[in-house]
Amino acid sequence: ALRKIIGGGEFVGWFQTFVCFVIMVYYGAVLAWGVQYTIYSVNEAWGGDPTSFFLESFLEKVPGNTFSWAPAWSVMIPLALVWVLVLLVIGRGLSKGVEAANKIFLPLLIVLFLALVVRALFLPGAVEGLNAFFTPNWAALADPKVWLAAFAQIFYSLSVGFGIMLTYASYLKPKSNLTGTALVAGFANSSFEILAGIGVFGAVGFMAHQQGVAVAKVEGLTGPILSFVTFPQIISMMPGGPIFGVLFFSSLVLAGVTSLLSLLQVVSGGLQDKFGWSPARSALVFGVPATVISLALFGTRSGLNNLDIVDNFINSIGVVSSAIMFAVLCAVAGPRLGALRAHLNSVSSVKVPKVWEPLVGIVIPLVLFIMMAMSVVDLVTKGYEDYPGGYVMVFGWGAVAIAVIAALIFTFIPWRHRTVDTHATVTQVLADDADAIASTEGDAQ
């Protein structure tokens, strides 16, 4: 799509594609953890020490922040099964695969999660948890890292800035109601996130109540520790814990599967467009190496360490830089934002105001660049957490470098699939819409 608008845009498109590739390679491991913990929830297999069970018995984590090729079979086996499942779905194509799967998984996810939230709200101490959830921490807003993490999270959550929404948008009919659809998607996503927060903090409030401490004193509220240590501990404390556990981890798996399918569709769609391959062939070509890499790096005893580093770098640098390049490309190198806004207003029910242009073309890219630059300087000078420099170089900077190098290679590979040169058509459509809007505004004045 970006290649058709401007020649240099193809690199940005492939960079987004390989950012998705890197994310999906490690994201499958989180799904594998969720699958196993859904089973473990039946009899609360973690016992009285969820931390030791997760790190030692389940992940078989190596001591310290080191690397190991040794497999962790309790992770590797379900991880292999996850990859087989999602590749079979992607191989069936968009309508028979991704769309059909989402018609099952998304309604089921909503039902399970609603049951989970209702259960959490009636736990002792849930109100204290909700008070903590809805009370702003104004001091934290002064930290640029918080804003960068928030941008990366909302980009990932809304699937914007790194290819997913662009891929799905390419399947829309011409003259679709773009802003109306975008508002529905954004509202639905934010509503579900608030619902998730209510459920999580209701459960955390219960845990604080049981321990006789304030919610702020509860440890393990970030990253994998929240889902796989803190929540099992909460599950063990509450009446009907196994039922709550199955609901929670089933919801986690279903949400993860739908996210992983969207990441896979970006890569599959890119290969289909570039080489004219079928969905099945595309799934095989990228699925086999993705599965091998995923098993070799994240199905091992150092899988948690590897995931932690790659996730931090590819989100705070890869996803954010992708969003910056995309915004700049649309604002400067491609069709001007004024013409794009006019086109959006000509086909959509909700009109885009003029302030959208400087926000998307100048303010947001500039703010993102400044925050990302500060984060990069911090990572270069201080490193990441307590990991050795070489470890961070390979899995952190290396993950970003792989996305850049792969994007360059695929940009220069000749297209083997006949494409329609729509640059003139796109430009003309935008120009016509801009003229029509300008004429209408002039008549109104």
Locate each region found by the language model.
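C-terminal membrane-solvent junction of multi-pass transporters and transport-like membrane proteins
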Residues: 17, 275-287, 314-396
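Transmembrane alpha-helical segments of multi-pass small-molecule transport proteins
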Residues: 4, 14-17, 48-91, 159-166, ...
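Membrane-embedded translocation segments of transport machinery
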Residues: 99, 103-261, 271-285, 289-290, ...
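Inter-helical loop and helix-membrane interface segments of multi-pass membrane transporters/permeases
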Residues: 1-15, 30-91, 95, 127-148, ...
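Hydrophobic alpha-helical transmembrane segments of multi-pass membrane proteins
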Residues: 15-26, 81-88, 148-159, 247-258, ...
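Hydrophobic alpha-helical segments and their helix-loop junctions in multi-pass secondary transporters
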Residues: 27-52, 110-134, 205-206, 293, ...
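Juxtamembrane interface elements at the cytosolic ends of transmembrane helices
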Residues: 1, 80-97, 101, 113, ...
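Terminal cytosolic tails of multi-pass membrane transporters
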Residues: 331-354, 382, 389, 394-445
